[in-house]
Amino acid sequence: MIVDRQGRRFRNLRISLTSACNYACTYCVPNGKRLVAAQDELSAEAMARGVAYLIEAAGIDRLRITGGEPLVSPKLEAFMGAVGQMGLSDISLTTNGQLLARKLPLLVDAGLKRINVSLDTLDADAFRSIARGGDLATVLDGMDQARAAGIKIKVNMVPLRGQNLDQVMPLLDYCLERGYELRFIELMRMGHLAKDSNAFLQQFVSLQQLLSLIGEHHEYLQANAPVDATAVRYEVPGKGFFGVIANESVPFCRTCSRLRLSSTGWLHGCLSSSNRHYVGDLLDQPRHQALPALQGLLMKALGDKQEVAFSGGATIMKIIGG
């Protein structure tokens, strides 16, 4: 196991199955151009081998499948079939939900138990304005079908001043009624927002601002969460839970256990670091040759982690999967 001087280790792997996405969300790709799959994306077999090697080299035991949008990838079935046999303690997936109903049989057959659905509003007009793709009713129907199939659902919402702040309470109440756990995600200084402070501040909604708004409608109590959790979690007594991933207001860098692998074979140890480490060539090598070199790169990736607080990063989130 590789541990740094802060006592941090890699435990959670987020793997971007593809950079392609069927949305073009305003806070992710401001030019409105949908991202497509990179020409040099790894195969499903190479990605699965990467997971197996990282389990052994770093002690990874939790996997989240991201994108882009993972449900648009033709690699999904083969990849999930492979990683489902690796003994991981948890496998989850983040999706925009547009293809959820269509892909649900595949996900159920693969044994998936948890999904996070990115959904920023229940208003159809605001949905079209923010996502610039897809259909709201299709997403909601997919979520209902997934819940009926026994899959646990969390909803990710990015509150944006001037765009969807009026949707905080409708979406929270919607989730509480259906047993979904809503996660508010503070806007992050990533991609174009790392360079444009004015654009960031004009849209940013803080943890305290969110709690003040929610407190006008619901009583809530802070709930327990794992030490390396990204979200500050709250309980609405008798109704359910919500969380806030408050990377600006309450940085969690000191306990971060996340490692990211892009669809093109780059390891990212920290979203706030411009450093990345190419492992694509190692994934074509036999285990006994790949592991020593991989462990060296993991040491470097762990050294990239910030000690105190997130300071932003130039990478587009869609490329490395949030």
Residue ranges with predicted function:
Residues 23, 124-125, 251, 277:
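Glycine-centered loop/turn positions within well-structured domains
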Residues 44-65, 69-185:
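Radical SAM/AdoMet-radical enzyme domain recognition
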Residues 5-45, 58:
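Canonical Radical SAM [4Fe-4S] cluster-binding loop centered on the CxxxCxxC motif
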Residues 158, 185-189, 245-247:
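Histidine- and/or cysteine-centered catalytic micro-motif in compact active-site loops
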Residues 33-37, 123-130, 191-197, 278-279:
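A short acidic, helix-capping loop that chelates divalent metal ions and anchors anionic groups
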Residues 191-310:
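Accessory C-terminal segments flanking Radical SAM cores
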Residues 69, 302-322:
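Short flanking/linker segments adjacent to small metal-binding domains or redox-active Cys/His motifs
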